[in-house]
């Protein structure tokens, strides 16, 4: 059965708008995806009919909201095949999830002289927290270098590991190159050497089925807004045995058992230990609806459609003279490119005049820009609602820019 692209597009209301008198071609979902009506309706319905502060409320609305919040936790656990809903921590997004691990796991388990491995393709969110921790704790940060095609050489990993190495933190899918790292194989190598593994899944969960138990990772993080859900909500999965040993990283309400000015404070069990303060309950409802949406379409069907579109786009872009595409042939979600000597900002600005939305800049990956010796790149990203017609418009727009600017 063919992918129901026309129906899918009709379910995303923002796709109907025009930009600069042109139909919008939204090719920036890797930055943030648009939302289906089902997600918008669920969040609105919660505010209209079900909103209340969760935890400890004895009245009906509070009890219902708490039950719905925990139901979303169960839904997320099933979505990534966690062993238990108690391994699912609600956070603001991928960035906060990684910072939580750095500040809790890192400060508790890592000692001066220990080392952490990251890769050269990481988003700043999976670089800067480790740099901050390394500076504070006297750790060593080791970088797994890229190959020219934007992939990792797995044969290089053993040379980065010694007795001091405690953690590997890497992305599953590069937010710039679309490189799909073989994270299951990488995790197996790292775990065999005694490392803990954190996987940044921000660019993966919307394109492919994720099974954290099969991956055997210790931590997995992703954001809701890239998964067609609301902004301000994300997920940190943590292996339960590790979470039990980790101290809280923020203090406040909801994350305690008892507070005493004389006897001190005792903390709640995970995951609530890591969820201080009033949570983004409406965002949780929207995230649950987003998971329902992609599950209904089927991640396998979504992945097949997107891969077909990606192959079409890569072939079509060959028609543009002096266009340089970065990264491997096999990729997910994104195409990073530059057009001759033209600055990415200028290319993006021209495309916007034609109603085509792409992302330009360093994409929060300055070390990757340095690897390719460029200050910036253009990035077009493909999602389940994009079409071949939009790819054709991108190609035509780039050809037009080439004629105008030379």
UniProtKB/Swiss-Prot annotation:
Pathway membership: Cofactor biosynthesis; iron-sulfur cluster biosynthesis
GO biological process, one term: cysteine metabolic process
Keywords for the protein's UniProt record, in alphabetical order: Cytoplasm, Lyase, Pyridoxal phosphate, Transferase
Positions of the catalytic residues: 364 (cysteine persulfide intermediate)
Modified residues (N6-(pyridoxal phosphate)lysine): 226
Cystine pairs: none
Keyword Ribosomal protein listed: no
Catalysed reactions, semicolon-separated: (sulfur carrier)-H + L-cysteine = (sulfur carrier)-SH + L-alanine; L-selenocysteine + AH2 = hydrogenselenide + L-alanine + A + H(+)
Family matches, as InterPro entries: Aminotrans_V_dom, Aminotrans_V_PyrdxlP_BS, Cys_dSase_SufS, PyrdxlP-dep_Trfase, PyrdxlP-dep_Trfase_major, PyrdxlP-dep_Trfase_small
Pfam families for this protein: Aminotran_5 (PF00266)
GO cellular component entries: cytoplasm
Primary location recorded for the protein, binned into one broad class: cytoplasm
Known EC number: 2.8.1.7, 4.4.1.16
Transmembrane segments: none
Record text on subunit structure and interactions: Homodimer. Interacts with SufE and the SufBCD complex composed of SufB, SufC and SufD. The interaction with SufE is required to mediate the direct transfer of the sulfur atom from the S-sulfanylcysteine.
Homology family: Belongs to the class-V pyridoxal-phosphate-dependent aminotransferase family. Csd subfamily.
Cited HAMAP family: SufS_aminotrans_5
Function of the molecule: Cysteine desulfurases mobilize the sulfur from L-cysteine to yield L-alanine, an essential step in sulfur metabolism for biosynthesis of a variety of sulfur-containing biomolecules. Component of the suf operon, which is activated and required under specific conditions such as oxidative stress and iron limitation. Acts as a potent selenocysteine lyase in vitro, that mobilizes selenium from L-selenocysteine. Selenocysteine lyase activity is however unsure in vivo.
Protein name per the record: Cysteine desulfurase
Organism annotation: Serratia proteamaculans (strain 568)
Phylogenetic placement of the source organism: Bacteria, Pseudomonadati, Pseudomonadota, Gammaproteobacteria, Enterobacterales
């Amino acid at each position: 059965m063919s992918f129901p692209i026309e129906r899918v597009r009709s379910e995303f209301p923002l796709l109907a708008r025009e930009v600069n008198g042109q139909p919008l071609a939204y090719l920036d979902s890797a930055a943030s995806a648009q939302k289906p009506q089902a997600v918008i309706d669920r969040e609105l319905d919660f505010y209209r009919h079900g909103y209340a502060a969760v935890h400890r409320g004895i009245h009906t609305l509070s009890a219902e909201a708490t039950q719905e919040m925990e139901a979303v936790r169960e839904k997320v656990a099933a979505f990534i095949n966690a062993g238990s809903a108690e391994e699912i921590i609600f956070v603001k997004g991928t960035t906060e999830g990684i910072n939580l691990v750095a500040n809790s796991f890192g400060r508790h388990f890592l000692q001066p002289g220990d080392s952490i491995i990251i890769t050269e393709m990481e988003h700043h969110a999976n670089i800067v927290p480790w740099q901050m921790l390394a500076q504070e704790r006297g750790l060593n940060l080791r970088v797994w270098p890229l190959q020219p095609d934007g992939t990792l050489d797995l044969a290089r990993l053993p040379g980065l590991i010694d007795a001091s190495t405690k953690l590997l933190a890497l992305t599953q899918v590069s937010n710039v190159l679309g490189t799909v790292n073989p994270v299951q194989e990488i995790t197996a190598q790292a775990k065999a050497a005694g490392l803990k593994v954190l996987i940044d899944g921000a660019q993966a969960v919307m394109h492919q089925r994720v099974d954290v138990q099969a991956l055997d990772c210790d931590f997995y993080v992703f954001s809701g807004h890239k998964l067609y859900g609301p902004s301000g909500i994300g997920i940190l999965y943590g292996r339960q045995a590790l979470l039990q040993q980790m101290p809280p990283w923020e203090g406040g309400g909801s994350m305690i058992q008892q507070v005493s000015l004389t006897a001190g404070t005792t903390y709640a069990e995970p995951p609530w230990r890591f969820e201080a303060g009033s949570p983004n309950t409406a965002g949780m409802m929207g995230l649950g609806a987003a998971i329902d949406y992609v599950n209904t379409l089927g991640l396998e069907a979504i992945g097949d459609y997107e891969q077909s579109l990606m192959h079409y786009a890569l072939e079509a872009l060959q028609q543009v003279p002096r266009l340089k595409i970065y990264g491997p042939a096999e990729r997910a979600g994104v195409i990073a490119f530059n057009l001759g000597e033209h600055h990415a900002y200028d290319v993006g600005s021209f495309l916007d005049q034609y109603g085509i939305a792409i992302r330009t800049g360093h994409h929060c990956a300055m070390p990757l820009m340095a690897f390719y010796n460029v200050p910036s790149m253009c990035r077009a990203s493909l999602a389940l609602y994009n079409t071949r017609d939009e790819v054709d418009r991108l190609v035509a727009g780039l050809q037009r820019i080439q004629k105008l600017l030379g």
